[in-house]
Amino acid sequence: MIPGEIQVAEGVIELNVGRKTVKIRVENTGDRPVQIGSHYHFYEVNPALSFDRELTKGFRLNIASGTAVRFEPGQGREVELVEYAGTKTIYGFRGEVMGKLVGAE
């Protein structure tokens, strides 16, 4: 092995297999870019992003960990969200959900 070399296993890595997903259309109605990280609770993103928020409670972007999606002013696009796993207990973000999601198993 060479110092700094990364060795990876062969094959395809599948993310979030078997998890519930939803696709929604999102538009940035603001005058500044908005960037959303991979694990941010989508329901609580910047209010300048226009979409059906109720559909997104308990979901985050279905993208690789540590990555993000950026919305330029006036830009709209469809994104895929994936449901949080585990106890579905959410704290922080914008403080709109502070605890276990209602109806979470």
UniProtKB/Swiss-Prot annotation:
Q: Where in the cell is it found?
A: Cytoplasm
| SUPFAM superfamilies for this protein | Urease, beta-subunit
Its EC number is 3.5.1.5
Any one Gene Ontology BP term:
urea catabolic process
Q: Which InterPro entries match?
A: Urease_beta-like (IPR002019), Urease_betasu_sf (IPR036461), Urease_subunit (IPR050069)
- Which pathway does it take part in? Nitrogen metabolism; urea degradation; CO(2) and NH(3) from urea (urease route): step 1/1
Its GO CC terms are: urease complex
Disulfide bonding pattern of the chain: none
Q: Does the keyword Hydrolase apply?
A: yes
The protein's superkingdom reads Bacteria
Q: What is its main location?
A: cytoplasm
Pfam families linked to this entry: Urease_beta
Q: Name one GO molecular function term.
A: urease activity
EC top class named in words: hydrolase
Reactions catalysed = urea + 2 H2O + H(+) = hydrogencarbonate + 2 NH4(+)
**Known CDD domains for this protein?**
Urease_beta
The alphabetized UniProt keywords are: Cytoplasm, Hydrolase
Gene3D superfamilies the record matches = Urease, beta subunit
- Would you identify the family this protein belongs to, as annotated? Belongs to the urease beta subunit family.
Subunit structure comment from the entry: Heterotrimer of UreA (gamma), UreB (beta) and UreC (alpha) subunits. Three heterotrimers associate to form the active enzyme.
Supply the PANTHER family for this chain: UREASE
NCBIfam families named among the record's database cross-references: PRK13203.1, urease_beta
Q: What protein name applies here?
A: Urease subunit beta
As recorded in Swiss-Prot or TrEMBL, the protein's gene is named ureB
